């Protein structure tokens, strides 16, 4: 591979970053995958697979491993960031001075900025300036299924139409990976943050033993909370009926591959927050997202009762069953009301 002709540099060699890199490489593109731990990258290069997360998926020959950040960023103008939301801003500030003058950046990170609750687009603009084209991909994607080449569909939104078209062409694979463009940059970002919160709630409900009826009601009312918050931020309500909204919400709330759902189930079964996090063993994005989404809702005056009760369980020591009963005991109202 010529040092500067890769189609994409992927920043983040966890399960999802690796799965996206494999998908791009399988599409016939030269891809560079960078990770912050040189030993981990050396292991990936030696094994030609990510044995920790995706042990049965060999790397295509066009997937190249790199532990030097400057070299990785020089390889392509297109940069795909796949890191946890709480380090997103830090990573962008780290890569900014090393990016090519013609760089364009897309992220698959789901969530909001830690502590502030800001959308990641605002974090990116602050870190990178106003000139770099930005994009986000989001939707119902478990890394194992994506890497295995099972059929998957996502949404893509960008600040730049040319970048959006190029990304859609790079990512789209008629055999297994369908990419829908969407002009709603805010909505595509927001869905991925709120669904993490609701998935914890769905897990709690199942952990308590409330059954399928309760889980479905929670998903439906969670979608209403997502839509209300989106409307307050200027998103298109139709976005939340698509891949980045309802699609991701249903997947994360109903399948045990979801760390957020499994975390919630443990809480519903009586485990404390710290023990549940330790048992999961990987980042539970919804834990931080709950605090961030709640802050965003308060800032915009949006009532989100499910999010509030999950926050009370995670940060204030409330019992999961008690939180569920609080929701069930709320005053009667019109299903279409704004609160």
Swiss-Prot record:
Q: Name one GO molecular function term.
A: protein homodimerization activity
Q: In which pathway does it act?
A: Membrane lipid metabolism; glycerophospholipid metabolism
Q: Give the EC class as a word.
A: oxidoreductase
- Keyword Lipid biosynthesis (UniProt): yes
Indicate how activity is controlled.
Is allosterically inhibited by G3P, the product of the reaction.
Q: Which Pfam families match?
A: NAD_Gly3P_dh_C, NAD_Gly3P_dh_N
One Gene Ontology cellular component term attached to this UniProt record is: cytosol
Recorded catalytic activity of this chain's protein: sn-glycerol 3-phosphate + NAD(+) = dihydroxyacetone phosphate + NADH + H(+); sn-glycerol 3-phosphate + NADP(+) = dihydroxyacetone phosphate + NADPH + H(+)
Q: Which residues bind sn-glycerol 3-phosphate?
A: 110, 139, 141, 195, 248, 258-260
The record lists NADPH as bound by 15-16, 36, 110, 143, 259, 283, 285
Task: Tell me which PROSITE patterns the record gives.
Answer: NAD_G3PDH (PS00957)
SUBUNIT field: Homodimer.
| Summary of the function given for this chain in its UniProt record | Catalyzes the reduction of the glycolytic intermediate dihydroxyacetone phosphate (DHAP) to sn-glycerol 3-phosphate (G3P), the key precursor for phospholipid synthesis. Is able to use both NADPH and NADH with similar efficiency. Can also catalyze the reverse reaction in vitro.
Q: Which family does it belong to?
A: Belongs to the NAD-dependent glycerol-3-phosphate dehydrogenase family.
**PANTHER family, per this entry?**
GLYCEROL-3-PHOSPHATE DEHYDROGENASE (PTHR11728), GLYCEROL-3-PHOSPHATE DEHYDROGENASE [NAD(+)] 2, CHLOROPLASTIC (PTHR11728:SF1)
Q: What is this protein called?
A: Glycerol-3-phosphate dehydrogenase [NAD(P)+]
């Amino acid at each position: 591979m010529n040092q500067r002709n890769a189609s994409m540099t992927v920043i983040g060699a966890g399960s999802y970053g690796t799965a996206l890199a494999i998908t791009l490489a399988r599409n016939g593109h030269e891809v560079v995958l960078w990770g912050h731990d040189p030993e981990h990258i050396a292991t990936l290069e030696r094994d030609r697979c990510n044995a920790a997360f995706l042990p049965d998926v060999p790397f295509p020959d066009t997937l190249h491993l790199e532990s030097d950040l400057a070299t990785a960023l020089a390889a392509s103008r297109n940069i795909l960031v796949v890191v946890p939301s709480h380090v997103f801003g830090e990573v962008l500030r780290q890569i900014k001075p090393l990016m090519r003058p013609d760089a364009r950046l897309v992220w698959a990170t789901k969530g909001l900025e830690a502590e502030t609750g800001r959308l990641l687009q605002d974090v990116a603009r602050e870190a990178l300036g106003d000139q770099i084209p930005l994009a986000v991909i989001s939707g119902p994607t478990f890394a194992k299924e994506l890497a295995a080449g099972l059929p998957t569909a996502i949404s893509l939104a960008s600040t730049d139409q040319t970048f959006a078209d190029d990304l859609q062409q790079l990512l789209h694979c008629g055999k297994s990976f369908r990419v829908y463009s969407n002009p709603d940059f805010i909505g595509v970002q927001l869905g991925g943050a709120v669904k993490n919160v609701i998935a914890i709630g769905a897990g709690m409900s199942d952990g308590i033993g409330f059954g399928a009826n309760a889980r479905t009601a929670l998903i439906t009312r969670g979608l209403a909370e997502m839509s209300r918050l989106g409307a307050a931020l200027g998103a298109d309500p139709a976005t939340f009926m698509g891949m980045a909204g309802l699609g991701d919400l249903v997947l994360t709330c109903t399948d045990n591959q979801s760390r957020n759902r499994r975390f919630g189930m443990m809480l519903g079964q009586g485990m404390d927050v710290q023990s549940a996090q330790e048992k999961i063993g990987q980042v539970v994005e919804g834990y931080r997202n709950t605090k961030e989404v709640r802050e965003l809702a308060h800032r915009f005056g949006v009532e989100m009762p499910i999010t509030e009760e999950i926050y009370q369980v995670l940060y204030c020591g409330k019992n999961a069953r008690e939180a569920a009963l609080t929701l069930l005991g709320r005053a009667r109202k019109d299903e279409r009301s704004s609160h």
